[in-house]
Every structure is written in C-alpha cells, then in structure tokens.
Amino acid sequence: MNGTLDHPDQPDLDAIKMFVGQVPRSWCEKDLRELFEQYGAVYEINVLRDRSQNPPQSKGCCFVTFYTRKAALEAQNALHNMKILPGMHHPIQMKPADSEKNNAVEDRKLFIGMISKKCNENDIRVMFSPFGQIEECRILRGPDGLSRGCAFVTFTTRAMAQTAIKAMHQAQTMEGCSSPIVVKFADTQKDKEQKRIAQQLQQQMQQISAASVWGNLAGLNTLGPQYLALYLQLLQQTAAASSGNLNTLSSLHPMGGLNAMQLQNLAALAAAASAAQNTPSGTAALTSSSSPLSVLTSSAGSSPSSSGSSSVNPMASLGALQTLAGATAGLNVSSLAGMAALNGGLGSGGLSNGTGSTMEALTQAYSGIQQYAAAALPTLYNQSLLTQQSIGAAGSQKEGPEGANLFIYHLPQEFGDQDLLQMFMPFGNVVSAKVFIDKQTNLSKCFGFVSYDNPVSAQAAIQSMNGFQIGMKRLKVQLKRSKNDSKPY
C-alpha cells in the first residue's frame, strides 16, 4: 500500500515504524489510514490479527509506517495518551516498534569535543558528512551564545557513527584547542546516572576518610548513623542503576578491602542499626560502658523476655567477637556500639521486654560487625568461624526449628549456594543454605532456602533483606510455611 503520487515507492531512510495500541477491533486498514493521514502520507498499515479465529479478528493494535520520520513523530505527539477512539476506554498508545529500538537515537548520537570555538553547525556538518547522512547537528553554547567547543552529531545509522569515530577521533588538533579532537558516542541517561552516583559516593568517601574512622576499627565509634544510612541508600541506588557498580564501590578508598558481597552486608548492617536506634527502650537497660564484650553477652543472657530463651540465644553468637575485642586494645562495648550507629539509642535504651525487636536489631547489628571486621582486620579476626560455617551450611538442606526457615525468591541467576550463605550469615548461625537448580538445564531456578538455628535470626534476616535490591531484582524473603500447612511454601 503506497502513499500518494508525490512520494517515492519507499519511505525515507530515517522513517520510523510505529506500534499503535488501543485501537477498536472493528477498525480496518481504511479506518486507520483516515486517522493517520491527518499527520502525513502513510506508506503502510498492518493490523495485527488473531489467526486462530475464522475469519481472523483484529487484536486491537497495528503497525503504521509513514513516509517521513517527521510525520510519525507528529502523529505520536498528537495521539499517544491524548486521543480516545470510539468505543475504547483508554487513550491511544503509540510508540516506535521494538524493531526500531535497534536504531535508537542514543546508539547513533556522537559527542564531539575539542572543536574550534570558531566553528558553526554548518562547519561540523561538512566535517562529518563524508561518513553518512546526518540527522541532527548541534553545537553546545553558553548563556552568552558562544560555543563551548563541543557538539553533538546524530547519524541515521549506528554504522555511520562508528565509521566517523574510527576516522575522526584524535585525527587532528583544531585551532585554539590544546589537544586533538574527541569523537565518541554520547553518554546515555543510564551512563549519566551511574556517573552521578559514583561521584556522590566518592565525595562521601572522602569525607569519611578525612575523619580517619576507617583506618582504625577502635575509632569506629565516631561513625554516626547518617553514614551507615548513606551507604545503604547509595548501594541500593547503584544496584538499581547497574549491578556492576558494586565492583566500583569496592575499589574506592577507603573501602578497598570490601568486595561486593561484604558491601551488601554493610548495607544490611545499616538497616539493622537504624532499626535498633528507633526502637523504644525496654526495662533492661544496656549501657555503653567500657566493659569488655563479654559483659554485653552475659547481660543479654540474663535479660528478661516474654518470648523465652529463644529470643536471647542469638546473643551468644557475640562470643565470636570476644577474640577480636581482646586483640584490639580499646575496642569495647562503646566502640562497637558506635560502629553499629547505636551509641545514641543504646545509651538510654535497652532490650525489649515485649516484642524483642531491639534484641533482633542488636543481633543483626553485631553479627554484621563480624563481616566488616573480617574485611577490615583479617589478621585479628578468627576466619575459621566463617570457614566452618560455610563448609557445613552451603548446599545442605537441613531445617532449623519452627520459624527459623526462610524461603527466598528472586535470586540473581548467577547466585549459588555459597553466595546465598554469605548474604544471610550476618543475621545469625546458618545451618543450611540451598539454591534450587533445574535438573534439565542445570541453571538456577532463582529461589532457595536458608535455615537458622533460631527464629530471631530468621526475623532479623526478613527485616533487613526482604526487598533488598541486587542488580535489577528485589529479594522476597519470607518464612517457610509449617509442614502442617496444606501448601509447603
């Protein structure tokens, strides 16, 4: 179906094939042509039909190709989310077809730097036109209208843009420039977001480094909750932008000793610290004195709780930190409280006598310190604790007591048993961690189980890890249902 006689047989090279939804099923190509030709000559219309019906019925959507790109964009501006067709409840949806995404503007747009400020748009067009048809050329100018010495050039195809890069990048030094011309693909919105987050994180790192708190674990009592909360926020933002940025975080001073998984543990620690700081105080006060860590352990063990012994057992895991506390002069309860950003809340707070939520938050915070201490002071930390737990728990399917078994959805495809174990170890003693594998494909099914030796650790893990973002996925962490339930999970 060709357009009017004043058009060639084929549409322009930069024409866009558009997908159109929310079209009445009773409309045919003729009806649609009358609608679209208001904005320009139409080359082709293809109504999508259900071939399983006889005769085939419209699916309420179509593809339309105008002769010119301009006509397609004008139609989109006038119709998309603007016009409701007869008999429909929602406005027309009009956007470039999926096949057009392969030729998106951001894939064809070049940034040209180090150009002479005497050049205008026409000069740039002449310079780059040998490499293909130029769709747009724009020189960046300041408020005074003067050139900033850089420009954007958009070709009609990516291949043309790549040819221009190979031929022109650093090929000459223009008048008034100190270095050769720069020709590269322009930053996409995703690139800009990643750079912004990395820059923001770098600034905060420098502030923390200036405070000299990371070089000495005993000095971490100066690390306030605002810093831990900031790390949690930045880690989540970065994961949303690009999972690869976690590697960038781990390479930045002064966090160079932490890998991506340990950074995630630190983020979980921040959430735990924040939860503990906001918890109402109970009846058993916990003071930030200079007593050794063992005092905290014994105090927790004797604190009253309405939920029985199960709510205080997790505090026994703090004994693993006594070696670290003893080996580090000056590292006492006050220092550890500062590290966990609890120094404000613990001074007047205490272990809850009702819900045990403060106890849970403390369990999260101090077990999280084990992960940080292992990364920051490996020579002082007893690595055998983690090694023994890893060997015994990863890949096994042992179950803990009632209420201590978790079901984890939306795991990244590449996660294995060991990754799952490391992610949930900060919240207590893991007796098993298992990622389920499809036996036919040998690939992860993206869900798994984690079992603790007590319910409080499981609740702590749910509180911090449910909704935690890894890459483009958010974990769903919930208790595994009782065997007595009709549905196992």
Curated annotation (Swiss-Prot):
Cellular localization per UniProt: Nucleus; Cytoplasm
Coiled coil: none
Keyword NADP: no
Keyword presence, RNA-binding: yes
Gene Ontology molecular-function annotations: mRNA 3'-UTR binding
Family: Belongs to the CELF/BRUNOL family.
Protein function: RNA-binding protein that may be involved in pre-mRNA alternative splicing, mRNA translation activation and stability.
Source organism of the structure: Gallus gallus (Chicken)
Top-level lineage group: Eukaryota
Main location: nucleus
Single GO biological process annotation from the record: regulation of alternative mRNA splicing, via spliceosome
Domain RRM: 16-99, 108-188, 404-482
Name the record gives this protein: CUGBP Elav-like family member 1
SMART domains noted in UniProt: RRM
CDD domains: RRM1_CELF1_2_Bruno, RRM2_CELF1_2, RRM3_CELF1_2
A GO CC term attached to the entry: nucleus
